[in-house]
Every structure is written in C-alpha cells, then in structure tokens.
C-alpha cells in the first residue's frame, strides 16, 4: 500500500462511487468551508495505481494558540475491513496533521452500525478513541450520528406508497392544489434567503446570510451536486381552479336538492351532502378572496417554499429548507419534497437523506417535531457508528475537549442562577 497523488476530479470520482462516500468528502465542499476558517488537504492510498482509500482533511486553527484541529467529516472513504488501506490513510493523515500542529484528528465515517463491526474494531485497534453511541443530535458530535433516509430507487407509485398513509394523502392533495415546483438558478437564492429568514423567525432559530447559500451553490452547482428548488403560487391560475370547483359544488347541491324532492329515503343523506358542499363553498369563497387580494398585490405570484438539494453519486441530501407563513393549506413543502425525490432519482440517486434526527424522541423533546416530520416519508433510521478522535497532543486535547466544555457549562449554570435572583 502506497501514498498516491490524484487530482481533485479523481478524488471526487472515488468518493461518489464508494458506498462509504459522502457529500462532505467532495473537494468542492471544502470550498464552502473557507468562509468559516477551514482549509483542506487531501490524501489517497492504493496499490498498483488503483485507489483504495481517500480522505479530505479539514483544518481549523485553535483560537489564540499555534495549533489546529483536523476534522475528516464523514471520512475516511475506504473499506474498513481493509486494515492495510486504513492504516496507510492514518499514517498519511498523521504526517500532514503533525506538520499543521494538530492536537487531534477527528473522524465520523458514513458507516452504519449494523455494517460497522470491522470499522469499530479496526479503528480502535489503530488507537482511535470512540465517542460512544449517543443520541443522533447530541451536542457532543459535530455531525448527526443518526439521519433519516428514504430509498427512492422505485417508480412514482411505489415511492408515493412508501410514505405513511396520511402523508400520502397530503402529497396527493398538494399535487392538486395548484402550486408549481421550479428548479431555480442562482438568482433564486435571494428568494430562498428571504424564506429562510421567515422560517427562522417562525421556528425560533438563527438563520444564515445569503452569502452562505451562494457559497454552497457556487461551489457545487457546476458539477450538478447542488440544485435550488422553489415552489410558486400563481393566483390567476388558482382563481380559475377555485371558480371551477365552486361551479361543481353548486351543481352538486342542486343534484341533492332534486333528490330530496323525489326520494324521502335519501333526504337525510342528501341534507348531509348539501351541508358538506356548503361548508366547502364557504372555504373556497374565503380562499378566492385571498387569491384575488394576492393577484392585486402580486399578479406574477409568490414563492411559498424552497430547498437546496445536494448530491454525492447515488446519494442525495435535503440540505436546507424554508417556507412562507402564507397559503400553508396549499402544502407547498409536500409538493416540493416529492418533486425533489423524483428529480434526485432521475439524476442517479437511490437514497434521499433528510438529515439529522434522534431515535423516536419523547413528545416533549425539542427534537420531536423534526423526527415526526421526517419519519412519514418512507424513511429508515440510518444510525452511524459515530465520532472517533485520534489524539496527537494529550494535554491540549484534555483541555479543549473535556475541561473547556465543563467550564462553559458551569458558567451557563452560574449565569442562570444570577438571573433568577
């Protein structure tokens, strides 16, 4: 086994074709990390000119100290049963890490627990310290240890039928409601950033500046690994649909009124059907007024939701999503998710990753809503083997990874107590 010098294109081709490859190991992903102070180095090992393992090493300086952290996000990309290749990757990583004055090498492979026996054993044998099997969204991990994944290597009907029953109904309803899903361009990021700001204010989280999303799009779109989708509501088109539905409902009422006159047996059923139709008419009249007001203010329509869809070979990722507070009954997110899954499948993906979650959290958990949303899309829980540290400077590692977090927690507790007084 020997070190190899390969191009960025060869690195990415290996990552995209390997079962343990991941979006975060693509060379263009490293470009997106520069804004936050990370810089990258890459290594590859193989035999007789054939690549057998690669890794993208991200480095970040420790504040006020002449040291760095090395983070190999979702790496190494290698067959973890191949001890020789794994050892060669670690040797190459250590060589670069020492030159960068790194106190620890941190990895979190894209290897699931039920397939990770070799990885666990061989990494520990090499001296890696396992961070344990904590909840998926534990703050002790950089990346979520658990994600929710939908298999999408099936036809449209099979895909739809893989969703939970109630969610299937919502998707079908969303398809009828009259929104349009667009694959947008870079200009659409302005709209997406505005929707993200609305989402953050509604759900209580800090949002990224538009430059963050532009950075991701610019780095990965050219290779087809980043796409922006937006969902639009056209008022004129939907007013016509509402008018058609109102005509149908009035015709239905007339039909049941006629039956009431000719058949006493059907009178009760007819009255129930009439009442139901009248309720629908009232709702449609309200919707029509809202759409007419929208047409006056925005005759070209408005965008209701958006998302960034990412790729790494046969894997696709729902990376960021945002939505408006308006016309939520149109279920734009359901239309968008189903459309993005089909797009991902048509472009070579077999899986659609919804991102991090905990495993079946309690209803009072802050993560319950996230899990509840992701579980209805025909997903399975992808539980990774977790995070590992290879320590190069034990005193500094002890200070940064263990002592400092405890001091931070202590400060927070003291601050809370003082606020209560």
UniProtKB/Swiss-Prot annotation:
Gene Ontology molecular function: aminoacyltransferase activity
CC annotations in GO: cytoplasm
Cell location: Cytoplasm
Superkingdom, natural source: Bacteria
EC number: 2.3.2.16
Family listed: Belongs to the FemABX family.
PANTHER family attached to this UniProt entry: LIPID II:GLYCINE GLYCYLTRANSFERASE
The name this protein goes by in its record: Lipid II:glycine glycyltransferase
Organism of derivation: Staphylococcus aureus (strain COL)
Primary gene name: femX
């Amino acid at each position: 086994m020997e070190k190899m010098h390969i191009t960025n294109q060869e690195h990415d081709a290996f990552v995209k074709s390997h079962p343990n490859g991941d979006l975060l190991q693509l060379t263009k992903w490293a470009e997106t990390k520069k804004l936050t102070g990370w810089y990258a180095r890459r290594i590859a090992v193989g035999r007789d000119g054939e690549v057998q393992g690669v890794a993208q090493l991200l480095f970040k300086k420790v504040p006020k100290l002449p040291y760095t952290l090395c983070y190999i996000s979702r790496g190494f990309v290698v067959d973890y049963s191949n001890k020789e290749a794994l050892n060669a990757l670690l040797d190459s990583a250590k060589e670069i890490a020492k030159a960068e004055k790194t106190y620890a090498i941190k990895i979190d492979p894209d290897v699931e627990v039920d397939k990770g026996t070799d990885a666990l054993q061989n990494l520990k044998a090499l001296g890696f310290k396992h961070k344990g099997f904590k909840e998926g969204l534990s703050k002790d991990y950089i990346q979520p240890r658990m994600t929710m994944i939908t298999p999408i290597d099936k036809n449209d009907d099979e895909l739809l039928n893989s969703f939970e029953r109630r969610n299937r109904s919502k998707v079908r309803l969303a398809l009828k409601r009259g929104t349009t899903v667009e694959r947008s361009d870079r200009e659409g990021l302005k709209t997406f950033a505005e929707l993200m700001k609305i989402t953050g204010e509604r759900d209580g989280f800090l949002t990224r500046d538009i430059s963050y999303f532009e950075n991701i799009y610019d780095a990965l779109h050219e290779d087809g690994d980043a796409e922006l989708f937006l969902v639009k509501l056209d008022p004129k088109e939907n007013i016509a649909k509402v008018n058609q539905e109102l005509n149908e409902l009035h015709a239905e009422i007339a039909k049941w009124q006629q039956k009431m006159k000719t058949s006493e047996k059907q009178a009760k059923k007819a009255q129930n059907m009439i009442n139901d139709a009248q309720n629908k008419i009232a709702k449609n009249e309200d919707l029509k007024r809202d759409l007419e007001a929208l047409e006056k203010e925005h005759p070209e329509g408005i965008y209701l939701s958006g998302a960034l869809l990412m790729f790494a070979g046969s894997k696709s990722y729902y990376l960021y999503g945002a939505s408006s507070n308006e016309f939520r009954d149109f279920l734009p997110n359901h239309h968008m998710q189903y459309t993005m899954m089909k797009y991902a499948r048509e472009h070579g993906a077999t899986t659609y990753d919804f991102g991090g979650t905990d495993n079946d959290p309690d209803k009072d958990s802050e993560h319950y809503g996230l899990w509840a949303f992701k579980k209805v899309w025909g997903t399975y829980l992808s539980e990774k083997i977790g995070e590992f540290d290879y320590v190069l400077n034990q005193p500094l590692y002890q200070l940064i990874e263990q002592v400092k977090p405890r001091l931070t927690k202590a400060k927070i507790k003291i601050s809370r107590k003082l606020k209560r007084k």
